[in-house]
Amino acid sequence: MHSFASLLAYGLVAGATFASASPIEARDSCTFTTAAAAKAGKAKCSTITLNNIEVPAGTTLDLTGLTSGTKVIFEGTTTFQYEEWAGPLISMSGEHITVTGASGHLINCDGARWWDGKGTSGKKKPKFFYAHGLDSSSITGLNIKNTPLMAFSVQANDITFTDVTINNADGDTQGGHNTDAFDVGNSVGVNIIKPWVHNQDDCLAVNSGENIWFTGGTCIGGHGLSIGSVGDRSNNVVKNVTIEHSTVSNSENAVRIKTISGATGSVSEITYSNIVMSGISDYGVVIQQDYEDGKPTGKPTNGVTIQDVKLESVTGSVDSGATEIYLLCGSGSCSDWTWDDVKVTGGKKSTACKNFPSVASC
C-alpha cells in the first residue's frame, strides 16, 4: 500500500496538487497544471483550480462527469496547442457545478492560427466549450479570447452564464468566421446575463429549447441576436425566449428569426425588448422562413410556425445600404405578433415582405 506521502509526491509529479485531505478522505481542493492530471484527478476534488494549463494538440480539457457541487476555477492563462480538428477545446458536465475565473485569468485560444475566412469550411477548426449536461450550474466571469470557431455549445438544463467576455475582435481583420458566442439547443432554462461579445457570427443563436433568457448583452461585430435556424433537427421547438436590454453594433443583423424551408417545427413566446442597434449592414429586424442549405431562397414555407412574437422598444439605425425591416413568412404560419415602439432608421424599406401579421410594419 502506498503511503500518503508517496501519493502526494505522485500528484505533484503528474501536475496535480491536493490539499485539505486525510489518506482516507476525498481531496477537498486540487490544483492542476496539466490537462492529463485534471482528467485523471477531477472526481476526487470538490474544488478544482486549473493553473496555467497548456492543453496538448488535439486534446480536450476534459472536465466531464464532475462530482455534484464541484467548483472550477480558471487561474492564470489557459492555452491550447495547435491541431486541425473538431474539438472541443474544453468539455464540462455535471450538476450544481460552479465555474469562475480568478482575477487576471485569460483563456486564450489563439484562434488566428486556424482562421482562414472560411469558418466551418476550409481547414478543420475546433469548437471552444461544450456545456453539454452541465445542469443546475453556473459559469461566471470567464475572460475568453479568439476562439477558432463557435464558443459555447449549450445543451443543458438550468444553466446560468454571467459576465462572460468573448473577445474575438482580432477576427475582424484576421479571418475569423462562424465564431458564434452562445449556441443553444435541446436546453430548458438557460440564462445569459451581461455578456460582452465581439465576434463574427451570432451573438446568440437559439436552435431549440425552452425558457431562455438573455439580458444586458453587448454584441459587436457579428450577426446579432438570433432564433434559429429552426428546422431539420431532432428537436425543432423554440419556446419562451426573452432577449432584452441589449445593444447590437457594427453587425450584419440586430434581431433575427429564421426557419428552414420545407421543415416542420414551432417558434413561440418570443420577446425582444429594449434592443438598441447601430451600424447594422444587412437587416435591422429580419424574420424569414426560407432558409435552405444555409442560405435564403426568397421562397418561404409554412411548416415551422412563428407565433406569439413580441417586439417592444426595438430601436436604432442601420447603414444606408441595409434594409431596415424584412418580414418573409409562409402562408398563415406567422401569427399573434405584438409590435410596439419598433423604430429602425437609416436604411432602405423592403418591397419583398410577405404574409406578415398586420400589426407589424415592413
Swiss-Prot record:
PbH1 repeats, residue ranges: 156-186, 209-229, 238-259, 267-289, 301-322
UniProt EC number: 3.2.1.15
Glycosylated sites: N240
Coiled-coil annotated spans: none
Primary subcellular site in the record, as a coarse category: secreted
Record's keyword terms, sorted: Cell wall biogenesis/degradation, Disulfide bond, Glycoprotein, Glycosidase, Hydrolase, Repeat, Secreted, Signal, Zymogen
Gene Ontology, cellular component aspect: extracellular region
Superkingdom classification of source: Eukaryota
Disulphide-bridged cysteine pairs: C30-C45, C203-C219, C329-C334, C353-C362
Catalytic activity annotation: (1,4-alpha-D-galacturonosyl)n+m + H2O = (1,4-alpha-D-galacturonosyl)n + (1,4-alpha-D-galacturonosyl)m
Propeptide: 22-27
GO MF annotation: an example: polygalacturonase activity
One annotated GO biological process: cell wall organization
Subcellular location(s) per record: Secreted
Transmembrane segments: none
Signal sequence, renumbered to the chain: 1-21
Consequence of changing D180 to E/N: Reduces activity by 99.9%. No effect on Km for substrate
Keyword Signal tagged: yes
List of catalytic residues: D201, H223
Stored SMART domains: PbH1 (SM00710)
PANTHER family: ENDOPOLYGALACTURONASE B, POLYGALACTURONASE
Role of this protein: Involved in maceration and soft-rotting of plant tissue. Hydrolyzes the 1,4-alpha glycosidic bonds of de-esterified pectate in the smooth region of the plant cell wall.
Family indicated by similarity: Belongs to the glycosyl hydrolase 28 family.
Name the UniProt record assigns to this protein: Endopolygalacturonase II
Naturally occurring in which organism (per UniProt): Aspergillus niger (strain ATCC 1015 / CBS 113.46 / FGSC A1144 / LSHB Ac4 / NCTC 3858a / NRRL 328 / USDA 3528.7)
Name of the coding gene: pgaII
